[in-house]
């Protein structure tokens, strides 16, 4: 995944984009942007003689670093004032602390919670072992699914709230390429609930068609962390 990041060429004006109902990221001239035409469907398949958990660990760690890097390019525009909630379309995400308590937070706070918690996990030898002979915990796959769900939220927020800045920085090709690779990998190993990703099905359909046959999932309330259902047309997760 060395293809991910290049230097930015321009500085956006820092203003929060107009309501993204127009979904600029779906416009053909933007969805065509890629930094490689590699067939990621082939890249995500588990290689022969490679342990499944090793493959999941390696790719999950890499996706974490690259999504963190992608977010860092627009982080100065994602503030407590511009993004008072962690929102994507009509869905508002809440963080759940170690005691399972729901925490309402701004988007930058949510992303910080995500990146800090994932960083702690991927550097924990008991969870992501790197030394020969160390075994993965029995709960490893469920932990990977949790990580992927949170990383998906970050990617979705970048598209929904900060695509204008990403476009101004000429990094939308990087974002699209990262999204395709991440989604195809997650679908290959059933790491994301279709209900969780349904909010971005329109983008997934456009970007991944012909790249691995990604199927759209139905919509649903209370997916992911077990948040309550829709209220006033705003879903909480």
From Swiss-Prot:
Entry binding sites for Zn(2+): 78, 83, 157, 162
A GO term from the CC aspect: nucleolus
InterPro entries according to UniProt: MOB_kinase_act_fam, MOB_kinase_act_sf
PTM text: Phosphorylated.
Region of interest (Disordered), ranges: 1-21, 217-237
Signal sequence, start to end: none
Compositionally biased spans, kind Gly residues: 217-229
BP GO terms, sorted: signal transduction
Keywords: Cytoplasm, Metal-binding, Nucleus, Phosphoprotein, Zinc
Any one GO MF annotation of this record: metal ion binding
Stated family: Belongs to the MOB1/phocein family.
Function: Stimulates the autophosphorylation and kinase activity of STK38 and STK38L.
Stated name of the protein: MOB kinase activator 2
Lineage: Eukaryota, Metazoa, Chordata, Craniata, Vertebrata
